[in-house]
Amino acid sequence: MKPGITVLLMAGGFAIASVLAVPLARAADVFILSSPAIQDNGTLAIKNACSDKQRSPNCVGENVSPPLAWSNPPDGTKSFALLLFDPEGRAPAGVSHMVVYGIPADVKGFAEGELSKPSDKFVGGKSLMGLGVYTGPGTPPNTDWHHYTWTIIATDLDPKALQPGLTRDELAKALEGHVKGSAGLVTRFRHPT
């Protein structure tokens, strides 16, 4: 071998050995939001779409919230907030489909449909539709996919610290200095016609 290649291979081996010696974060330590029904970037079912045809003719579903679960929240977490946002809806502002918070730290998820109605497990905020519970997608016909960003936020606030009815922006302001970490999941939906 030429000396240049030998030196290069030795340097490469040293670099690999150095990288392998660095402790890596275990996946088990990462704060994760998931759904047993939908993979990240997966599609929401028709039943997850909004159902109030009087409010929007684009509603084609049953307004059943998908099941969600989270694991490995940061140390010191006292409560969670959970948001659902569609950045493509009503462009350029986007649509806030759900704002809930005050979720106790011992809650690790919600069953299918559980976020579609008031619960002792969360404080209802105010979505764009003025509701404190889940409102599913209502995309117009003949439009491209919309992306629905689910965000779980770990906070150091007591579950009863915030008043009901906060909008997404009001919640963001109230959480300043109290966020321990967050995790997200993206789902997609488009009108079936």
Q: Predicted regions span which residues?
A:
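Positively charged n-region of N-terminal signal peptides that target proteins for export
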Residues: 1-5
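N-terminus-centered regions that define maturation/targeting leaders and the start
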Residues: 24-193
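Short hydrophobic/aromatic-rich motifs at helix boundaries and adjacent loops
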Residues: 6-7, 145
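Bacterial N-terminal signal peptides
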Residues: 8-21
